[in-house]
């Protein structure tokens, strides 16, 4: 491609509303242009990268024998009403009516559609297992779209769906897709982790997220330094601590704590550390109006874990202070588990404390030297807390460490959630109708592009991994407009590299060298070749890698093989 015939428009200034590096650099390099809130046009340069992502994904999906199809973006409301998600999916579902007042949504995902198709197409166990995928535009009505294409309202996604009759078959396909995702991100040159994750609104029995590691990532990931264990903050657990091996010999004592309402205030007032206290949170229950959740004072409640407890209402709902005072006759800052006449669920780390300070269920009063069993009873012990840096890994191997990531893929073992709701069944080997079970496998095509930039950039611009770069090589002829020798040699080099199937940009614009070099660094082309009269006199071409500040001279007759070897490494 010749730059003079290419739409190459770069910007020196960083747009004011671009908060993170990928958003800034995608705008400055001319990859995208904003149309509206969370809506972006992919310009020619950006589209080249997007297509490379799609091609890698498509190749690896095809290797798993998944079959590509394309489903409508607009979906009838009846399908979503069958599964109950029309009401529960929330405000991110963009709904509309046609001229006949029939309701539709612009699909954020396609579980209902694929299940509807397959319940009509699949009749026998002989047709299973099957796996279908599509690469398609989705829409989620984000309240606050931000970070460019990282959290846009319209985005491109690869979503795949598999159908099975046995858990064993589902697990086999799940493993194949998991490995395909690993190959995809390996080929893209990205540093990533596959982490255990909550199934969220999609549902199912098991799931893994694929997180591209980046300091700007919104997700917290915990991983072991001595094993393969990794999970996001919602799912991460630590090794369960043993119960206190020594009984508390101190007498429980009621003390005054005037106007001390928070854990930090109580701990400071009593001259103790916050990890010597416990806190009691009152939430809505499933069968009981209120349920108490008890954690060590220095721990944070993990709301996702809490909602999985059978006694806790989902979504999690905290009881307001006025209702607590009216029902429990205790102000919020003085609540504790002793003689609390509602179900009490205690976190394992709180249960491991030999003694603790807790609210006394009287205004401005706390107990010190309280102990479980002797003084405080509980209904269940459960993992309620967010893990912390330095916690022991749940597999007993190593310690947990924290990093940040950007979720770019998510695979789920759905089970029969959608098939059961939509009566998707086939005849099994015994001649009986059996509900199918499903897996689903999502990968954010547009988000991968932004995540790659977040992981691969410097103060000058993007540093593309070779597999994703819009062009692999940039040839810059210095003063090509005035030097026929430079122009001809650059053209010859351009044609030779093209003949070997290499993506080459010949930057033949009539610009100063500084502008051409700066644009190359901004766009992030991995390999730069500079053709100049001075170097040609020595029979050389100047080479520079985007990852290095050093340049080197390559003999003219060796430069093509030199580039081919670099690209094939």
From Swiss-Prot:
What is the species of this protein?
Legionella pneumophila (strain Corby)
EC number(s) recorded for this UniProt protein: 6.1.1.15
Q: What family does the Swiss-Prot or TrEMBL record give for this protein?
A: Belongs to the class-II aminoacyl-tRNA synthetase family. ProS type 1 subfamily.
The domain of life for this entry's organism is Bacteria
List the Gene Ontology MF annotations in alphabetical order.
Answer: aminoacyl-tRNA deacylase activity; ATP binding; proline-tRNA ligase activity
Q: What is this protein called?
A: Proline--tRNA ligase
Its Gene Ontology cellular component terms are:
cytosol
Description of how the protein assembles with itself and partners: Homodimer.
- This protein's gene is called proS
Where would one find the signal peptide in this protein?
Answer: none
Reaction(s) catalysed (UniProt annotation): tRNA(Pro) + L-proline + ATP = L-prolyl-tRNA(Pro) + AMP + diphosphate
Q: Where in the cell is it found?
A: Cytoplasm
């Amino acid at each position: 491609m010749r730059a003079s015939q290419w739409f190459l428009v770069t910007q020196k200034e960083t747009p004011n509303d671009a908060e993170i590096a990928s958003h800034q650099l995608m705008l400055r390099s001319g990859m995208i242009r904003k149309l509206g809130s969370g809506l972006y046009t992919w310009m020619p340069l950006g589209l080249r990268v997007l297509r490379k992502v799609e091609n890698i994904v498509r190749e690896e999906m095809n290797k798993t024998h998944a079959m590509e199809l394309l489903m409508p973006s607009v979906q009838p409301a009846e399908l979503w009403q069958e599964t109950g998600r029309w009401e529960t999916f929330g405000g991110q579902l963009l709904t509309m009516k046609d001229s006949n007042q029939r309701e539709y949504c612009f699909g954020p995902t396609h579980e209902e559609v694929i299940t509807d198709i397959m319940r009509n197409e699949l009749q026998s166990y002989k047709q299973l297992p099957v796996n279908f995928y599509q690469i398609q535009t989705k829409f989620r009505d984000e309240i606050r779209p931000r970070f460019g294409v990282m959290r846009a309202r319209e985005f491109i996604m690869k979503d795949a769906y598999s159908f099975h009759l046995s858990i064993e078959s589902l697990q086999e396909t799940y493993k194949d897709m998991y490995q395909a995702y690993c190959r995809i991100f390996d080929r893209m040159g990205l540093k990533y982790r596959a982490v255990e994750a909550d199934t969220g609104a999609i549902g199912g029995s098991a799931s893994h997220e694929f997180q591209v590691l980046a300091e700007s990532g919104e997700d917290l990931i915990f991983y072991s330094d001595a094993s393969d264990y990794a999970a996001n903050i919602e799912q991460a657990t630590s090794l369960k601590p043993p119960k206190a091996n020594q009984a508390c010999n101190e007498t429980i004592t009621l003390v005054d704590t005037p106007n001390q309402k928070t854990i930090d205030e109580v701990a400071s007032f009593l001259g103790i550390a916050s990890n010597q206290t416990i806190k009691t949170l009152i939430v809505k229950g499933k069968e009981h109006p209120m349920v108490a959740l008890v954690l060590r004072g220095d721990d944070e409640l993990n709301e996702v874990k809490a909602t999985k407890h059978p006694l806790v209402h989902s979504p999690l709902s905290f009881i307001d202070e006025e209702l607590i005072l009216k029902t429990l006759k205790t102000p919020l800052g003085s609540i504790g588990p002793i003689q609390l006449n509602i179900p009490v669920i205690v976190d394992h780390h709180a249960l491991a404390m030999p003694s603790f300070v807790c609210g006394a269920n009287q205004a401005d009063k706390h107990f010190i030297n309280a102990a479980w069993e002797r003084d405080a009873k509980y209904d269940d012990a459960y993992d309620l807390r967010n893990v912390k840096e330095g916690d022991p890994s749940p597999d007993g191997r190593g310690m947990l460490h924290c990093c940040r990531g950007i979720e770019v893929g998510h695979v789920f073992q759905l089970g029969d959630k959608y098939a059961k709701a939509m009566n998707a069944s086939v005849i099994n080997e015994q001649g009986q109708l059996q509900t199918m079970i499903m897996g689903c496998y999502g990968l954010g095509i547009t988000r991968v592009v932004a995540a790659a930039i977040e992981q691969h950039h410097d103060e000058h611009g993007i540093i593309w991994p070779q597999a994703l770069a819009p062009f692999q090589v940039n040839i810059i002829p210095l003063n090509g407009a005035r030097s026929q020798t430079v122009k001809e040699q650059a053209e010859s080099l351009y044609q030779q590299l093209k003949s070997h199937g290499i993506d080459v940009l010949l930057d033949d614009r009539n610009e100063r060298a500084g502008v051409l070099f700066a644009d190359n660094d901004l766009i992030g082309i991995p390999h730069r070749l500079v053709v100049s009269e001075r170097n040609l006199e020595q029979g050389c071409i100047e080479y520079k890698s985007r990852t290095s500040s050093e340049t080197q001279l390559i003999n003219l007759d060796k430069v093509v093989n030199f580039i081919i070897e670099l690209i094939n490494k």
